Swiss-Prot record:
Transmembrane segments: none
Claim: Ligase is one of the keywords in the record: yes
Catalytic activity: L-glutamyl-tRNA(Gln) + L-glutamine + ATP + H2O = L-glutaminyl-tRNA(Gln) + L-glutamate + ADP + phosphate + H(+); L-aspartyl-tRNA(Asn) + L-glutamine + ATP + H2O = L-asparaginyl-tRNA(Asn) + L-glutamate + ADP + phosphate + 2 H(+)
Alphabetic keyword roster: ATP-binding, Ligase, Nucleotide-binding, Protein biosynthesis
Protein name per its UniProtKB record: Aspartyl/glutamyl-tRNA(Asn/Gln) amidotransferase subunit C
Biological processes annotated in GO: glutaminyl-tRNAGln biosynthesis via transamidation; regulation of translational fidelity; translation
Quaternary structure note: Heterotrimer of A, B and C subunits.
Cleavable signal peptide: none
Family matches, as Gene3D superfamilies: Glu-tRNAGln amidotransferase C subunit, N-terminal domain (1.10.20.60)
Record EC number: 6.3.5.-
Family annotation (InterPro entries): Asp/Glu-ADT_sf_sub_c, GatC
Amino acid sequence: MQIDDKMLEKLEKLSALKIPDQNREEFKSQLGKIVDFVDILNELDLDGIEATVSTIGGGTPFREDISKEGSVIDGILTHAPKKQNRYFEVPKIIE
């Protein structure tokens, strides 16, 4: 599939990105290669092949959920100009 300027502009809008003019041709080429690769994948005959969700036999092993106190918050709050309890105190911005 050929990615043209119109398609690239649509993708820019959807992704909320701005591609610099000097990179537009390179992006169109790379996106075209990605779409071509997906087309190749779509041509694969996967009839009779069961979908695989995980490669770990028996699923993901669970661990016990143990709560423990951490000192990360206290360390971060030492850099706060203002704090209240375990929270940053910031100026009110919405009235």
